[in-house]
Amino acid sequence: MLRVSVRSLVRKASSKAGSKAAVPAAAAAASAPLSPATSAASARAVPPVGESRVSIPPIPGVAAPRSHRAAAAPAKKAAAPKAAKAKTPAKASRKIKKAASKPSAPKQAAGKMRKAAGKAQRKIKAAARKAAPKKMAKSFGKKGAAKKAHK
């Protein structure tokens, strides 16, 4: 009898006030004396107890509040294999851009296309290895000023 009223009370409380309010309301209903006058409406009128925690056996058909659910281990994502990335300099050089944008020959067989794609990739990687940001040709030091004076 009491279990049925608590179940309905928990459902109503969880839908109205959120899952956190369901536990104190159910505790208040469980502590109320068993009498024919006790119903879900009168039990709801009882103010919920502030801090006291009462352990209630799980009721079938009623979802437990999030705080009482067993913490499920987060599902681990399968680690994707890391592809070898070409070491590119800070700024992409013109060589890399040219190698990447070279148009492939029109309408080739599948094997030739694959071969051409591989060639382009190798060219890009080679260009990335070789290309390093160039240093400034002009030096604004004292030597430069002395050279200008000798001219």
Swiss-Prot record:
Composition-biased stretches (Low complexity): 15-49, 70-91, 101-111
Compositionally biased region (Basic residues): 112-151
Subcellular location: Mitochondrion matrix, Kinetoplast
Induction, as annotated: Present at a constant level throughout the cell cycle.
UniProt propeptide residues: 1-9
Predominant localisation class: mitochondrion
Mitochondrion recorded as keyword: yes
Coiled-coil parts of chain: none
Residue span of region Disordered: 13-151
Alphabetic keyword roster: DNA-binding, Kinetoplast, Mitochondrion
Gene Ontology molecular function terms on file: DNA binding
GO cellular component: kinetoplast
Role of this protein: Histone H1-like DNA-binding protein involved in the organization and segregation of kinetoplast DNA (kDNA). The mitochondrial DNA of kinetoplastid protozoa consists of about 5,000 minicircles and 20 to 30 maxicircles. These circular DNAs are held together by catenation into a highly organized compact disk structure referred to as a kinetoplast DNA (kDNA) network. Binds preferentially to a specific fragment of minicircle DNA and is able to compact kDNA networks through DNA charge neutralization and condensation.
Similarity comment: family membership: Belongs to the KAP family.
Subunit structure of this chain's protein: Associates with the kinetoplast DNA network.
Name of the protein in its database record: Kinetoplast-associated protein 1
Gene giving rise to this polypeptide: KAP4
